[in-house]
């Protein structure tokens, strides 16, 4: 089955309430998934998992990433891959299922990523 925005959002919604702090295994469920694909480092407890979670949500039933450039664990890498593929869009044009990146500390380097559920023009959910 191919990946759709609805499916990605359903997978994301199915994880509401998950906490890596309550996970009895090392790291996060998304870090362990990413580690199976890319190396053990990503399974460590202290590794932030937002990009790995986004990558997990945007992987089809055959295990193929539908993200430009494939899975990513570092938000700026995902941005660079989207830019290189000509798929970087202004947040005001983001559609449900698109990835949206945030620069929480205002240093010019994005440090968080999530999935757009809805776009209301001046803000996204």
Where are these regions (language model features)?
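N-terminal capping segments
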Residues: 1-64
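...with weaker cross-activation on analogous glycine-rich loops/strands in unrelated enzymes
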Residues: 63-125
């Amino acid at each position: 089955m191919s990946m759709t925005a609805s499916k990605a959002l359903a997978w994301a919604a199915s994880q509401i309430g998950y906490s890596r702090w309550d996970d009895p295994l090392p790291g996060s469920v998304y870090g362990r998934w990413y580690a199976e694909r890319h190396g053990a480092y990503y399974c460590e407890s202290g590794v932030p998992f937002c990009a790995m979670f986004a990558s997990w949500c945007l992987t089809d039933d055959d295990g193929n990433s539908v993200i430009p450039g494939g899975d990513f664990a570092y938000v700026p890498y995902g941005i660079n891959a989207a830019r290189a593929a000509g798929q970087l869009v202004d947040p005001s044009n983001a559609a449900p299922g698109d990835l949206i990146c945030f620069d929480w500390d205002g240093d010019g380097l994005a440090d968080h990523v999530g999935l757009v559920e809805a776009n209301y023009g001046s803000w996204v959910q």
